[in-house]
Amino acid sequence: YCVVEQSQMERAIQNILVNAIRYSPSGELIRIALSETHGTIRGEIENTGVRVPDDAIPHLFEAFYRADISRNRNTGGTGLGLYIVHKIMKMHHAKYGISNTSNGVRFWFELPCRQPIDNSI
């Protein structure tokens, strides 16, 4: 199992999903994947559509930063969503990042988990 602050983790995942939807063409699918390996939960949320300029990726988790993407003119937002994700992931000692794919963007995180409690003792 993973120990998380539920409301904070819900907020982080919601912010990631909102961005994935916001920057995908209407009707496109959002891919969500979760897996567990060696006590770590890995999550990936991937969209198709607008890719992020490579020079903007290191700044996406900064407060009020918005990449120079023409679609930004048509989308709402304050530039705080990924900054909030950054703070919540750091709080949970998670590794995380964003990368471009061949046809979109992938957000990933690796959340360290504790070993399950042995109730047989």
What are these regions (language model features)?
Residues 1-4:
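Conserved micro-motifs of the catalytic ATP-binding
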Residues 20-21:
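Short helix-loop "hinge" at the ATP-lid/N-box region of the Bergerat-fold HATPase_c
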Residues 93-99:
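Glycine-rich ATP-binding loops of the HATPase_c
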Residues 52-64:
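Short conserved segment of the HATPase_c
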Residues 76, 81, 85:
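Short alpha-helical Gxxx[C/S/T] motif in the catalytic ATP-binding
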Residues 9-10:
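A residue-level detector for a conserved hydrophobic packing site
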Residues 27-39:
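Short beta-strand/loop element within the Bergerat-fold HATPase_c
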